[in-house]
Curated annotation (Swiss-Prot):
SUPFAM superfamilies: alpha/beta-Hydrolases. Glycans are attached at N12, N520, N555, N784, N907, N938, N942. This is GPI inositol-deacylase. Its EC number is 3.1.-.-. It is found in: Endoplasmic reticulum membrane. It comes from Debaryomyces hansenii (strain ATCC 36239 / CBS 767 / BCRC 21394 / JCM 1990 / NBRC 0083 / IGC 2968) (Yeast). GO terms for cellular component: endoplasmic reticulum membrane. Involved in inositol deacylation of GPI-anchored proteins which plays important roles in the quality control and ER-associated degradation of GPI-anchored proteins. Belongs to the GPI inositol-deacylase family. Pfam families: PGAP1, PGAP1_2nd, PGAP1_TMD. The keyword Protein transport applies. It comes from the Eukaryota. The chain crosses the membrane at residues 15-35, 703-723, 740-760, 805-825, 861-880, 884-903, 916-936, 943-963, 985-1005.
């Protein structure tokens, strides 16, 4: 090697060291930020729960009903002191409630049903048993059934997921049979699924053994509907693809002659599906994966985040979502409200169920909930109101009505609504007390505020039921025809002095929440007057009570920040709010629509604000919101913490999103503030927080670690093979990595990765990549694209829609380079340590020369290897998964490397080659481990049925044969120019596949490695034939 080559080599090594160090620092920083606790609206706030659980196993559900009876079990939950326990003699013949089935998730327990089941029983027996007014008169307690899957790994193994779905369909048939002797036997059950249990519930409906109409309501908790969380198993992806297609066809409005589509329409038409997700606190599953997307229309379901559910207002981690006190209260209330014991389905109609679900799980500010508002329906029951014009306080547009204890401007405060043709207006009301009912028997001294939407009348019949606000001194009468809209009030978190967390006013909190109502012109156009009446109670000692109401111009309450994503990233956004700002203002940020970016908002006030004599009745708070999915977060007491970290779930990698203007996906910030007269919020600054954005990459790109690291190892092999072809010496793996870091190569790689992000979202290119994907070529039903043109799905490379995030690819590559370098050095150190210990042990054994020269030991070992290979190839097709053989192959290769290290004088080329091969095998290993975990788990529970998938011995045969051939420490044979080009072309395609397809089709990385081993075998046998011909 000349001095110029040595200089380049030293430069490459220096760059490699620098880049690897930077990559490891970046990786550590990302992991540190991910494990650091969350604050503000993203901090945990669940309360502890208590219950008295008991479980009765239903032994009658045995092999005569299902072939899975020896593996799975069915239980009935009973709350001690509440639910009657089954009699030993009568068994389950006299069940009197409504059947509901709980499905645990990946490695979940049947006992996880206890929290929601206990709360449902408590609410029913404490509140519903006597059927008081205001509660569902047709409600009945639920009989909670739950499946014991022995903590099966449904996220790892597609066949296991199908087994569970098939078992549960048979379980539902059995459960309904338990009620056969009831006076009104049910024909369906409610399904409650956690994690992968929610996916199982969707699979159930698509199977042949599904009983028509046996499921009509599904509630899922943190269930990955939009995408499979792990892609180590091809069966999982096939199931997702088939089930998604079934559900899409079931709700597709297009006429079709397809038999499966017709079946899907019949089965799904009356099913409601609600997907509840815990948001950012879920450290196991990306919350983006829980969206329903194009699978379920708004008439049949929606996705909602727990941060926006009234009274919950907290993100919830993956396991806590089944026991969180606030959420279980909401879920239990919803279950009891949809119950209709008089119906054969034991629930109300789809329309009423959806209305109940929207009221229980959505914040009430969404346009989607307008259809459920009293003001929207304009009910037939009206309130006729007779008022004294002298007692009316007319509140002008833009003027705030302020009511505090004992201080009511007038018994009747009236907002006159302009014609919608003249101007669009918005009415906002905020109160520390719930909106009360206006009663006809008492028109004085109301202790709760009342809100009415009215139309002015000319006359009222004398015999009509009138609420009269007039007296003997009244000279001018004004008459109104009104509706009471108290049911339209939305519970929101308290934001006052001394309030620092959302949990303080959530369900079970020490402080009372606030209540708000907001109407736009779409609803207000039906009326000409808004009336606020009632006081906050003269006798009230709570001086913190208040009511604020305002009618404002709609346009004055809407602001747009026009900066795009690139502008927000580079310079941020800054703006000031007007002096005459309304009670609530919505700020739309069209450029902020990415799920993998965090945003920092800073609110600043004038310096002299604290010196003013005006005392706000509440502290400024922010409602952060977005639609599809419905995500709301509340940031309270902004004065105490004026810097807010905003995380959102908008357009996310690998999940379908509706094709529409990006502005419609933008983040919305609604600021509620009690304005100081003639003062203004000085500035609001918004910028992208790149540091906190790093933590958002972990869950969404955990599989990218494998694909990027494998691609880097393969790139190193490309340069190693090139050097071997030129010099007939196989260089070290470090040489391959240093070649990657040569300035020209490294720059080219970073440039390529940078342009991959923007071009991979181009639709024609996506269609082409889909066509040439070997997974799609194998099965045309497994597509990487959305099933409908109304939605878009980015499945390739990093799955990004944001062209401004071109740098994410290079960042991952730098991280991967650091991880691969660390892996190599760790492997080398571990190998040398083990080799040194082995050499010492061999010396101490003091083997005699006679023992060393035993006749033909190699032949004996060769025979054993052949027997071992034959045994493995025999058991794989009938019992063991091929992943077991791969793990054994990795162990064999590790031993092979140690043997080479022990033989200190061995040719370095052999060591370098085998060490590089071991690096590749070890990074492919994680793809195979999950299936092996499922296999071992089945063995531990004495599930004697042979493993039902992954028995293709061809998927491992080349690997086994190559390991057997390398038992004598061989290296690559000499290659002709043609074979060299084929080898390099295959390695290049392998790199391409890992980067473009590898994250969502990870399991195919193993199959490509298997093909690589097959090609290496061809090279060896061809070289052997050439040698034989030469000898002859």
């Amino acid at each position: 090697m000349d001095s110029k080559s040595r200089g380049k080599s030293r430069l490459n090594r220096s760059i490699l060291t620098l880049v690897s160090f930077f990559g490891l620092v970046l990786f550590y920083l990302t992991w540190y930020l991910y494990t650091r606790g969350l604050t503000g609206a993203d901090s945990p706030g669940c309360r502890i729960v208590y219950m008295g659980p008991s479980y009765a196993r239903i032994t009658a559900f045995d092999e005569s009903h299902t072939k899975f009876a020896s593996k799975y079990s069915l239980y009935l939950y009973r709350e001690q002191g509440r639910d009657p326990l089954p009699d030993e003699n009568e068994g389950f013949k006299h069940l009197g409630g409504i059947p509901i089935l709980f499905i645990p998730g990946n490695a979940g327990s049947y006992r996880q049903v206890r929290s929601i089941a206990a709360e449902t029983s408590d609410i029913y027996f404490d509140h519903y048993l006597d059927q008081p007014d205001g509660l569902n008169p047709n409600a009945k307690n639920y009989d909670f059934f739950t499946a014991d899957f022995n903590e099966d790994f449904t996220a790892f193994h597609g066949r296991t997921l199908l087994d569970q779905a098939e078992y549960l369909n048979e379980a539902i048939k059995f459960i309904l049979g338990l009620y056969a002797n009831s006076e009104h036997p049910p024909r369906s059950v409610v399904v409650l699924g956690h994690s992968m249990g929610g996916v199982v519930s969707r699979v159930m409906v698509s199977l042949p053994n599904y009983i028509p109409d046996s499921i009509n309501t599904i509630i899922t908790l943190a269930s990955p509907h939009a995408a499979a969380p792990l892609t180590f198993d091809g069966d999982i992806l096939k199931i997702y693809s088939a089930v998604d297609r079934f559900w899409f066809q079931g709700y597709d409005n297009k006429e079709t002659d397809n038999t499966i589509a017709k079946i899907a329409k019949e089965r799904l038409s009356k099913i409601s599906l609600i997907s509840i997700t815990g948001g950012l606190l879920d450290s196991i599953l990306p919350a983006d994966y829980t969206t329903l997307g194009y699978l379920v229309p708004p008439t049949n379901g929606f996705t909602v985040y727990t941060t926006g559910i009234p009274g919950v207002w907290t993100p919830i981690d993956h396991l806590a979502i089944v026991w969180c006190a606030q959420l279980r209260r909401r879920v239990s209330n919803a279950l009891l409200e949809i119950a209709n014991f008089d119906s054969p389905d034991k629930t109300y109609s789809l329309e009423k169920r959806m209305e109940i679900m929207r009221k229980n799980f959505l914040s009430g500010f969404e346009d989607y909930t307008s259809q459920d508002k009293v003001a929207y329906d304009k009910p037939a029951d009206h309130i006729l109101l007779k008022a004294d014009s002298q007692q009316i306080n007319f509140v002008q547009e833009g003027q705030k009505l302020k009511v505090t204890p004992g201080k009511m401007p007038s018994p009747l405060n009236v907002f006159r609504l302009p014609s919608p043709k003249v101007s669009k207006v918005q009415f906002s009301l905020l109160s520390s007390m719930d909106i009360g009912e206006l009663k006809s028997d008492n028109n004085e001294g109301y202790t709760q505020p009342t809100l009415l939407l009215c139309n002015t009348m000319d006359a009222i019949k004398e015999d009509a039921n009138i609420i009269d606000f007039t007296n003997k001194e009244t000279t001018e009468i004004v008459m109104f025809k009104c509706i009471d809209v108290r049911d339209d009030s939305n519970m929101i978190p308290r934001s006052a002095v001394g309030t620092y967390s959302l949990s303080e006013s959530s369900i079970g909190g020490d402080k009372s929440p606030f209540y708000a109502i907001q109407y736009n012109s779409t609803i207000l156009k039906q009326y000409d007057t808004v009336i606020v009446t009632g006081s906050l109670g003269m006798e009230s000692n709570d001086n913190e009570n208040f009511l604020l109401a305002e009618l404002s111009d709609y346009n004055s309450s809407q602001f747009n920040i026009h900066e795009d994503l690139f502008s927000l990233m580079t310079r941020g956004a800054k703006f000031s709010l007007p002096l005459d700002k309304p009670l609530s203002m919505n700020i739309k940020i069209p450029g902020a629509w990415s799920s993998i970016l965090a945003y920092k908002l800073k609110v600043s006030w004038p310096e002299d604000r604290e010196t003013t004599e005006y005392i706000p009745v509440f502290r400024t708070f922010i409602r952060q919101w977005s639609n599809e999915p419905y995500e709301v977060k509340w940031h309270v007491n902004i004065e105490a913490n004026n810097q807010v970290l905003l995380n959102m779930h908008g357009i996310a990698p690998y999940t379908p999103f509706k094709v529409k203007s990006k502005e419609e996906y933008g983040l919305n910030i609604e600021i509620w503030t009690d304005s100081i007269p003639d003062k203004s919020l000085t500035t609001i600054r918004l910028r992208i927080d790149l540091l906190n954005s790093l933590r958002l990459l972990v869950l969404r790109y955990r599989l990218a670690t494998i694909s990027f690291c494998v691609s880097i190892i393969l790139l190193a092999l490309v340069f190693q093979v090139k050097h071997y072809k030129e010099t007939n010496k196989f260089p070290t793996f470090l040489y391959g990595l240093s070649c990657i870091c040569s300035p020209w190569v490294f720059g080219s790689i970073l440039f390529t990765l940078s342009i991959l992000t923007p071009i991979m979202s181009i639709k024609p290119l996506q269609k082409f990549l889909n066509v040439i994907d070997p997974v799609v070529l194998q099965d045309s039903n497994e597509i990487n694209l959305s099933l409908t043109d109304e939605f878009k799905l980015n499945s390739f490379f990093l799955g990004l829609e944001e062209k401004s995030l071109w740098f994410i690819g290079p960042v991952f590559f730098v991280m991967g380079l650091g991880i691969v370098s660390l892996t190599f050095y760790s492997l080398l150190v571990a190998g040398n340590v083990i080799a040194s210990i082995s050499r010492v042990l061999l010396k101490r054994l003091k083997l005699s020369q006679t023992e060393k020269k035993q006749p033909n030991p190699g032949k004996l070992w060769a025979n054993r290897r052949i027997i071992g290979v034959l045994f493995v190839l025999l058991v794989i097709p009938i019992y063991m998964p091929y992943q077991f053989a791969y793990v054994v192959s990795c162990i064999i290769q590790s031993i092979q490397v140690i043997k080479i290290l022990v033989a200190d004088k061995t040719n370095k080329s052999i060591l370098n080659y085998h060490l590089s091969l071991l690096m590749l095998m070890l990074w492919v290993l994680p793809i195979n481990v999950p299936i092996l975990v499922v296999f071992v788990h089945n063995m531990t529970i004495n599930w004697t049925t042979p493993f039902s998938s992954h028995h293709n011995f061809l998927a491992i045969l080349p690997v086994i044969l190559l390991m057997e051939r390398y038992s004598n420490s061989r290296t690559l044979p000499k290659m002709s120019q043609t074979k060299y080009k084929v080898t390099q072309a295959f390695l290049a395609y392998y790199v391409f596949y890992c980067l473009v397809y590898g994250i969502r089709h990870t399991y195919w990385i193993h199959h490509l490695f298997n093909l690589l081993c097959c090609w290496l075998l061809v090279l060896h046998y061809d070289a052997q034939d050439d040698t034989s011909d030469h000898v002859q």
